[in-house]
Amino acid sequence: MQVILSPHNFGRYYLCGMETLIGTADVPIKAFADFSGKVASAFARNQAVYALSLMNEPHDSRGLWKQTAQAGLDAIRAADHERLVLAPGDEWSGAWSWRLYNDDFLLDDPAHHIMYEAHQYFDLDHSGFYKFDYTRNGASPDRGVELIHPFAIWLKQHNVRRILTEFGVPNDDPRWLELTQRLLVYLAREEIPWIYWAGGPWWGNYRLSAEPKKGIDAPIMSVLTSHR
């Protein structure tokens, strides 16, 4: 098993209990670069680490995310020239809005070993909370494909490596499974690898969990395992 190390700070740092945007006076970009370099150095020879992600779901960065990400990447490369680095886009890394918020998000990597990562959920507000049922969420069998498509177009335009590192659907309506089935066929055709959210026994009754219960697979597993 290998893991992705990803700081789940959303482009921010909690300073004295306050969420503070990276790139502001209190949390300068050089502080993020220092952190990134130290993480890279600490795990440089660890074979269990598949990749370093620069950040989980940065958002509302006031236009600072590209500069922040480049500084983090530069610091990683100073410590480790071989590790795969994942570069998430601004505004929650949404695939559906990638071209709107990340159209110029191309980083300079001297190692040429970077993948651009997106996330996508298929409910009405793309949050992954799935507050409404399938119909009220405006879902359809092709909604997954339609929302990923802008990201796929951008990838082709720039000929860069890519990965969908987070997506998930509720287990309580089989129509979500059909959406996922069509999405995974599309991702295979576009050569976009993927990671499903989420697994692990700590999720309990979480509707998106792929964890088995009492030895019985979650419904979504029948779809996911058919695309291994």
What are these language model-derived features?
Residues T20-A25, K30-A51, M55-I192, Y206-S226:
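Extracellular glycoside hydrolase catalytic/binding regions
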Residues F10-G11, V169, P201:
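Conserved beta-strand edge residues that scaffold enzyme active sites
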Residues M1-M18:
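Aromatic-lined carbohydrate-binding surfaces of glycoside hydrolases
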